[in-house]
Amino acid sequence: MLKVYNTLTKQKEEFKPLREGEVKMYVCGPTVYDYPHLGHARTYIAFDVIRRYLEHKGYTVLMVMNFTDIDDKIIKRARETGEDPKELAERFIKIFLEDMEALKVKPADIYPRVTDHIDDIIEFIGKLKEKGYAYEGSDGIYFEVKKFPEYGKLSGVKIEDLQKGARVEPGEGKKNPEDFALWKKAKPGEPKWDSPWGEGRPGWHIECSVMSSKYLGESFDIHGGGNDLIFPHHENEIAQSEACFGHEWVKYWLHTGFVMVKGEKMSKSLGNFVTIRELLKRYEPEVIRFFVLQKHYRSPLEYTEEGLQHAKNNLQRLYNTLENIRVALRNAEISYTWGELEFKTYEIIREGKRKFYEAMDDDFNTAEALKAVFEVANAINKYLTEANKPKESILRKALEFFKIVSEVFGVFEDYFREETKEREESEKLIELLVEVRKQLRKEKRYELADMIREELKKLGIQLEDRGSETTWKRIIT
């Protein structure tokens, strides 16, 4: 039974989607004015794994993720670079999508942009005005928070606390400090659109309410994002959406923990961030995924080079296991009998699979699931060391388990993809080069033999000489 931690209820709940077999999921996308960093990667890798696991369990998942392509930050950056705000946003949307593809994050089904939904936003604001939740001030349209009695149910924030010590700044047209903008009237030199309230642009919070509801309906299953969005963004989304629709809007709210740097949140404002592109120059994409998955998605994740190196080493351990299996399968025994060693190893594989699912069913606990993965890897390596003639059936059982891990975690994908004809052909070529090198060594033409070894190593193939015999395995760089 899958349980998820719901930020709305502050507890783990049995996951029951609104429609059996189908999950509708919205994840807040980036405001596109700069290069995405590891904090973004953490959130989107986490929700990618959540989506993958739901699909693995048989759910049909419809996933929507927006792009905020008009915002104060975009306008400010465009002024600094001399670009048109729309062009700047499109440039960083392209960069974001390239980075996600590199990290093997599956694309969302729909990527709505704010600027393509201005008419929908205006219509939504109009409904809030008609229902008495919104009013027009001198500089825009505002949502009147006190009209929504359940305000604060997600974050625990109380209206009276927002009012303490707060004041309406001169020039602001809102009635109360806690009210928030739905529509901002145009300022000189800023992008603007026509509306019944004059030219202007949307407020931030209204955008996600409109785009999620347009594609997923007035009620859907999962709304996700980083912890920093709980208040005010998601709190305000709930207020305006449930005020408009008159019923519960989202069933489960999921939030990822912060990436930390020396005890502080990684953020652009603090300048302590590392971009995804910088990381990809030093580490394979799977290493970054593995680094993220070693912690539960709700826990803080401390960024250190040592942590990434540790993730790389652990990932290499698993790749070594997979390669050991691959090598052993070339000479494995097809047998209808098992001995004590086979039964013992099979039990560890079976128990590892159970523990893996148990961990993932416990609010997508990837950290615990990985422990099960390493238990199986250790058992297989021990089996290969102790077995006189490894049994093919045991090795296939192990590969079946690792393929599940691959599907859910988004790692080893190239490895399993290469089980096709392409992999077989590449293996034949490698075997041929190994035989050629063997002959060169016999003829004492060591310079050429060493050249083959080094060239194969550059391609991720490591040769190991044991006397007159040579074995090979794949490595990650």
Swiss-Prot record:
Q: Which reaction does it catalyse?
A: tRNA(Cys) + L-cysteine + ATP = L-cysteinyl-tRNA(Cys) + AMP + diphosphate
UniProt keywords (A-Z) are:
Aminoacyl-tRNA synthetase, ATP-binding, Cytoplasm, Ligase, Metal-binding, Nucleotide-binding, Protein biosynthesis, Zinc
- Residue positions annotated to bind ATP are K268
- SUPFAM superfamilies this protein is in? Anticodon-binding domain of a subclass of class I aminoacyl-tRNA synthetases, Nucleotidylyl transferase
Q: Which cofactor does it need?
A: Zn(2+)
Q: Which SMART domains match?
A: DALR_2
Query: Which compartments does it reside in?
Result: Cytoplasm
What is the official name of this protein in its record? Cysteine--tRNA ligase
- Give the organism, scientific name: Pyrococcus furiosus (strain ATCC 43587 / DSM 3638 / JCM 8422 / Vc1)
Q: Which gene encodes it?
A: cysS
